[in-house]
Amino acid sequence: MEGRIRVTEFLLSVPAIGTTKTQDALRRLGIAPSKRLGGLGRHQRLRLRVFLIEREERPVRRRKHLVVLAGPTAVGKGTVSAYIRENYPEVLLSVSATTRSPRPGEVDGVNYYFVDDAAFDRMIAAGDLLEHATVHNAYRYGTPRAPIEKALDDGRSVLLEIDLQGARQVRASMPEARLIFLLPPTWEELVRRLTGRGTEDAAEQQRRLETAKVELAAQNEFDHRVVNHTVADAAREVVDLMMVRPAPVRPSTA
């Protein structure tokens, strides 16, 4: 049965390799992407075995953490992430792509990559996004894959600020990722923050609050929860959690 598995699928199942590294490995090993394990020649099998042994012996400390920060609308994810970017240079904050228009003060390539729907479709088709989702039934957001894989291989910790849908996709594709849920002190404070920022009309505010209820109900899916009383304290707690040694993978109860 194992011999029928394509080498591409086999490599993608190895932790921390990913699509980009798999493609590079196949080129170096001289193995076609469509080749199956059972169809490898003797020299190809040997090269693949050596490649896997070398990866296994590589110092574990080089591979840092991928951490996802998610939470309901207006909880302050962007503000906390910006604080981490400015005050914790050892952490790489991933820049997402989005189809929405820039808000006042946002800079393309720093806060987001602002793209149109056609460009976003091309990124999906090319497999360039680690995750993507439509948020608030309006705009699409996605995380470019290549910068994250390169940063992790270079030994940097990476923080992704994404929504609940994206967090679930990352958990499915990268189980070793650490998921942190950012909470408001109270529901009333969340409503105050949303209505006070003045970037949405009343109908949009109501839609976002309904989405927030769904997101808050899913907080137990996350590894850690942080309450955003103040930006500095929440940011410090998120960074501290990024540096904690990961717990063993929990066995499935299925």
From Swiss-Prot:
Residues 64-243 form the Guanylate kinase-like domain. This is Guanylate kinase. The gene is gmk. Its EC number is 2.7.4.8. Essential for recycling GMP and indirectly, cGMP. Its main location: cytoplasm. It comes from the Bacteria. It is an enzyme of class 2 (transferase). PANTHER family: GUANYLATE KINASE, GUANYLATE KINASE-RELATED. It holds the Pfam family Guanylate_kin. It catalyses: GMP + ATP = GDP + ADP. One of its GO terms (molecular function) is ATP binding.
